[in-house]
């Protein structure tokens, strides 16, 4: 229902307009206060890069963060990552992730990013505290990438990158809750890069698509072509589950059942194992896998995806960030 409201297919969005006006007024006032320096943002001693969204829902932001961290690491840059840690609840903040940190403590995305990149990752509702925690333990870190947080103006930033869904784009264009917008589309004029996941990019936007890898068994780590798996049940607890199901079909998989779950939904063995019958194979997203690995069964697999950016702009962006991190 919410997708139909935000896309404008359902007329119910009009009933929510008063709340959207209030949301827009408050969010605009907050940004203006920082812009006019009525409120002070904390500036880190190293450059900060924000990777965020203008809309609610999954746009492919986390794969972009992983891509960015890995690309900078390949250039010899030491990167730290901070996040709010949505869906997690730590005993205290800031929380610096370790191999023992669970998604219940830190949230799905931070654990995934930590496992994929081996970069220092810290979470806190106050992102500046997360930055301080990383720099205290890893003083050699040269640049901080913040996963989400475009609207978290308490943390000063040097570069802003926005990821948008190239198919859904901005829906009906209204602020939450009548539409999907956290900020209006005009905000794109002030950011440093716009990355478009799928669809047809517009002038000045960086094209991106998600490239699926081999399926990975949660228990054994065995890899295989996902099309070789039979009697597949697909599960996705991400911001936009249909994208994952479409990716599977693109890989030649016709799931017997597709199970969309809420983003950041807690998972346990009983609930997940109930999704598959004898002889069926469960295929999930990598984001779900970080929550299920501890209690996985032998017929559970996940499909990792990597962000692939096209054109000349990604190289220019990476050169800019490398120069910033190197102090040039």
Curated annotation (Swiss-Prot):
Single annotated GO MF: tetraacyldisaccharide 4'-kinase activity
Biological process terms in GO annotation: lipid A biosynthetic process; lipopolysaccharide core region biosynthetic process
UniProt KW keywords: ATP-binding, Kinase, Lipid A biosynthesis, Lipid biosynthesis, Lipid metabolism, Nucleotide-binding, Transferase
Pathway: Glycolipid biosynthesis; lipid IV(A) biosynthesis; lipid IV(A) from (3R)-3-hydroxytetradecanoyl-[acyl-carrier-protein] and UDP-N-acetyl-alpha-D-glucosamine: step 6/6
Binding locations of ATP: 55-62
Entry-linked InterPro entries: LpxK, P-loop_NTPase
Transmembrane segments: none
Annotated Pfam families: LpxK
Enzyme class per UniProt: transferase
Protein name stated in the entry: Tetraacyldisaccharide 4'-kinase
Source organism of the structure: Escherichia coli O157:H7
Gene: lpxK
